């Protein structure tokens, strides 16, 4: 594999053969650098560099090139013969599978000929499955090699794009790597731990929900039919839960089903509630397609509406309400827009007898070469009472909970070329190393720990737990409680919603002006929509569970997320939102795309008020 393709794959980017031949000559001539190309692809919000992206990039640097004849004719040499490259029509059909403007039926099929049956659309998105393994994306990016001779082959990624791939040669690991068996920290004998009785309850955990498999026409039905029905059940569940929340708002009145709009007389003002199938901005306003369990309708919200700015930020597949008038032309003209949102006023909770604190963290990434082990060990020493001031001594003596929100290890095979970024290349040893470190957390502190996308767990969310056969050392820690992603922990009567935070990716992709650099704002948008990852078919793989377990059914006192490696906080309508940063220093890829993590920052939360009272800074050891 040449350095051009190898460099792209190492940084998580794929390239089609036609794009390769467009770009490689200019790259070899030094007309652009790999960093420039990756930044350009990132600005287009894609990790696949096809001929369209390549042409745009070449124009931006003032260069163009003709395709070689064999590419024009649709063939690519692999060294093992020629293989046919799918034509544009085939690729368009394949890439339509990842469209976010999907339509999910939640009831009867609309009678209008213009509205395609929703299950047909889902079948197009998911594909026909004759049996065996599911074709639903699991988040794995590693392609299957089509031969076993170690040669270059053309393979296809999960989106159907062909790219040149050479199996990564992994040298036998000869040198020893750290598993931290020698890290032993005794509690400071001078620390006087305040006797506080623990009071916690796992209020919600994915594993506790009993899910019934969806009913299909016959027991011998195809796997694809079952998955389609599971997703349809998921969206019905979402609509039902969020419809109930919306109807608790006194302003959301006179609600009717979309199918009954045709019976509304004259200019009578009514409210509809449904899933957002699509959203389009025009010079005069926004046009939505909204669907409920009975039908679909086009909704127009004018630009001068007081809710226009809020409506502009709504994600595909979110559940919303519109108030307005139905036109006989089949368009609903809205004058108000409502999100499920958080109530303005909530009942105040009684004070606690004793001050008690919780520590929030995430994204430890044990196993990565960039894991800040010195900083993390300093943090463990701090928990054991080796502090720098009387104020810190008072706080640490009252800490009873440590909450870790996913990506506790760096994992294996998460992205192309990851092996070269690992100091611990074995997934079992990564969890053993983490357990050795966490065994130094004082026994009076309860650790809650859940999975993220780098962990050995189901890739699609919600994630019930770690795969125990890989993460067994964590399950053996006596003061540790394994939780799901998401989970709700009730601490002394206060509800803490813990999620890894992958939904932030979709918010940043769809909402102008929001970035990973300030994750508190995307977290607020998710809270307003009362959902942790609303968009189906976006960047976040969602499991085909018959019930939507990502709906925020009850308003928590605090929301903790991680994933983006940047510390940030926000308070929205009385809810504290915290992104708990990372223990991984900036990687080479992050440098190229200008992602600046904030490792070693640790928020301390007063459980009574559910507010961050202090942020510890261990970054100087990173």
Curated annotation (Swiss-Prot):
Its EC number is 2.7.7.7, 3.1.11.1. Residues 76-113 are annotated as: Disordered. One of its GO terms (biological process) is DNA catabolic process. It catalyses: DNA(n) + a 2'-deoxyribonucleoside 5'-triphosphate = DNA(n+1) + diphosphate; Exonucleolytic cleavage in the 3'- to 5'-direction to yield nucleoside 5'-phosphates. InterPro entries: Calcineurin-like_PHP_ApaH, DNA_pol_delta/II_ssu, Metallo-depent_PP-like, NA-bd_OB-fold, Pol2_small_arc, PolB_N. The keyword Nuclease applies. GO terms for molecular function: DNA binding; DNA-directed DNA polymerase activity; single-stranded DNA 3'-5' DNA exonuclease activity. Residues 85-95 have a biased composition (Basic and acidic residues). Residues 96-109 have a biased composition (Polar residues). Keywords: DNA replication, DNA-binding, DNA-directed DNA polymerase, Exonuclease, Hydrolase, Multifunctional enzyme, Nuclease, Nucleotidyltransferase, Transferase. GO terms for cellular component: DNA polymerase complex. The keyword Nuclease applies. PANTHER family: DNA POLYMERASE DELTA SUBUNIT 2 (PTHR10416:SF0). Heterodimer of a large subunit and a small subunit. NCBIfam families: PRK04036.1-2, PRK04036.1-3. Possesses two activities: a DNA synthesis (polymerase) and an exonucleolytic activity that degrades single-stranded DNA in the 3' to 5' direction. Has a template-primer preference which is characteristic of a replicative DNA polymerase. Belongs to the DNA polymerase delta/II small subunit family. This is DNA polymerase II small subunit. It comes from Pyrococcus horikoshii (strain ATCC 700860 / DSM 12428 / JCM 9974 / NBRC 100139 / OT-3).
